[in-house]
Amino acid sequence: YLNGKFEYMSEESRQRIADGIEELGYRPNALARSLKSKQSFVLGVIVSDITSPFSPILLKGISDCCDRFGYRILIANSDDEPRKERDYIMSMIDQSVDGIILNTTGGNDEFLRETADTGMKFVLADRTIDMDLFDTIHSADRDAIEQMMRYLKGAGYESVGYFTQPLTNSTRISRCQVFREIYSDYFNGTAQVYFLEKRQRDANVMQEYMRRNIDCKHAIFSGNGVSTMRIVQTMRDLNIEFPKETGLCGFDDWEWMNLVGGGLTTIDLPTYEVGKECVKRMMHLLHYARTGAPRTLELPCTLQIRQST
């Protein structure tokens, strides 16, 4: 009963044990449980940027699903620094976590391969690595970009500029690459990509975009929620109105985005579900024999159409 194996128990027996546990106030001893099974029933979770609204949503999905399986989580934030990521992985191994769910910074592919060779289980959340080594759960970004481009074309836009932070991780790289690849399927000319690097130069980037597209109906497509925040701040500083002067849309559907103007058109990512699926995948790795190649699961996104476009 305490291990959740009910298949050989009658409903009457289950209820009798449950009543006894409640009456006695029994609480399982996690240490004794781990010593017997040689498992800690703890998963390590490393996120790349704890300040991003993406991370708490991901962690909520992971935590809720871990509760269901009787696991606890140990959380660390790598600050998008590969060295910190390596240090936290080693620290979690020293603390005997059963597996690690990793929202990776990138730049640690060989280290991860060597660590996995020692037996540590990894599941990648949202971001991938170059080597096909680990099960990965992320959003179906290509389909989402296709949906957004079709919508913008249908709404009468003639040109779209893609705004992104520097391409330092797999998600930014893949989204930008897809945008470039499919742009000509919907619009004339070459794909326009604008990089938001130093905050003090955002106004220059925005002005360049506005000058380049002065003669057509145009829209900005933001690569993630952090970029969208910087774009909105810059447009406010330059007194640029959306959708009057340019349309605005992008990845991530954070709560504040519905409060700006008449709301921003967004791609609502299944971040909570990504967290849950990472845990389910980890449970499979820990409790069932591995067969076949690592698997990648893409979860569908939802377009939220609002007044910014």
Residue ranges and their predicted role:
Residues 80, 102-150, 168, 226, ...:
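Flexible loop/hinge segments that line or gate small-molecule binding clefts
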Residues 146-186, 190, 291-308:
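An alpha-beta-alpha
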